[in-house]
């Protein structure tokens, strides 16, 4: 959902319009009982139509995680006009590469957790308590933790999570992509992205340095910024640096 992006509202202090939205299937756009909608085509059409509706002839496009995947697809397959730059934040160009990197990081966990995850993937039973505990520990290491009372209100605010859309499109977790995005593969097309691209990831991110470097090496006009000690939400864990970086980047590419 858009909630956690509200930590970036300060970017509007520079006189920019900041637009974020809940994609169909989560948050304020949550709907039930339409599993046929949970695919890339739906969310791509949503982005295209939203841009038309708001008259966004020129913009800087920021895609975080799945949003970055959608941005890559948008630039490579639709070749839109008016994109001043793209910010690819903690995202990836390949479901296969992403899964490989998650499994590599799983090997640093306890043998008990490794076994629980391997068993779940082998049996298809993702409800076992041992697996659920292992997955929670994995996500705590590389994604994010439970918001604290001292965190900004937007992080603590109740939200409608798009679990159904996530499972249908991606899978039961970050390292088992068995949904309809399992064949997502854009490594060979990254060279066709002509827009300036800022690639951001955290040192402890689900988006590992290898994933980020793969994008950096392949996109001609790109810059890579690695955030030390950050997980999958660099913009939350180091908001000040993230905002400074984005302001600098957008000014350079206006």
Predicted regions and their residues:
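Conserved HGGG/HGGXW glycine-rich cap/lid loop of the alpha/beta-hydrolase fold
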Residues: 1-32, 36
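Catalytic active-site module of serine/aspartate enzymes centered on a nucleophile-bearing elbow/loop
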Residues: 222-254
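Conserved loop-alpha-helix segment in the C-terminal half of the alpha/beta-hydrolase fold
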Residues: 187-230
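Active-site loop signature of alpha/beta-hydrolase-fold enzymes
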Residues: 1, 26-29, 94, 207, ...
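Conserved acidic catalytic loop of the alpha/beta-hydrolase fold
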Residues: 41-59
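Conserved hydrolase catalytic core segment
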Residues: 57-101
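Alpha/beta-hydrolase
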Residues: 108, 112-195
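Flexible "cap/lid" loop of the alpha/beta hydrolase fold
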Residues: 84-126
């Amino acid at each position: 959902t858009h909630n956690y992006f509200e930590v970036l509202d300060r970017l509007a202090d520079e006189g920019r319009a900041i637009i974020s939205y809940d994609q169909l299937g989560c948050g304020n756009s949550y709907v039930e009982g339409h599993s046929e909608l949970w695919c890339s085509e739906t969310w791509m059409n949503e982005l295209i139509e939203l841009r038309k509706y708001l008259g966004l002839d020129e913009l800087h496009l920021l895609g975080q995680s799945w949003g970055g995947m959608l941005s890559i697809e948008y630039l490579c397959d639709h070749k839109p006009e008016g994109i001043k730059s793209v910010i690819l934040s903690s995202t990836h160009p390949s479901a296969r590469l992403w899964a490989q990197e998650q499994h590599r990081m799983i090997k640093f966990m306890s043998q008990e957790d490794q076994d629980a995850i391997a068993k779940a993937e082998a049996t298809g039973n993702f409800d076992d308590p041992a697996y659920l505990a292992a997955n929670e520990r994995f996500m705590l290491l590389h994604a994010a933790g439970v918001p604290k009372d001292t965190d900004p209100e937007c992080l603590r605010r109740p939200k409608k999570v798009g679990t159904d859309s996530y499972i249908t499109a991606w899978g039961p977790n970050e390292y088992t992509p068995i949904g309809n995005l399992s064949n997502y593969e854009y490594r060979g097309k990254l060279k066709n992205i002509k827009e300036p691209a800022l690639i951001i990831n955290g040192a402890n991110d689900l988006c590992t340095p290898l994933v980020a470097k793969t994008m950096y090496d392949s996109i001609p006009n790109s810059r890579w910024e690695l955030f030390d000690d950050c997980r999958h939400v660099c913009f939350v864990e180091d908001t000040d640096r993230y905002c400074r970086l984005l302001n600098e980047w957008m000014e350079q590419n206006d």
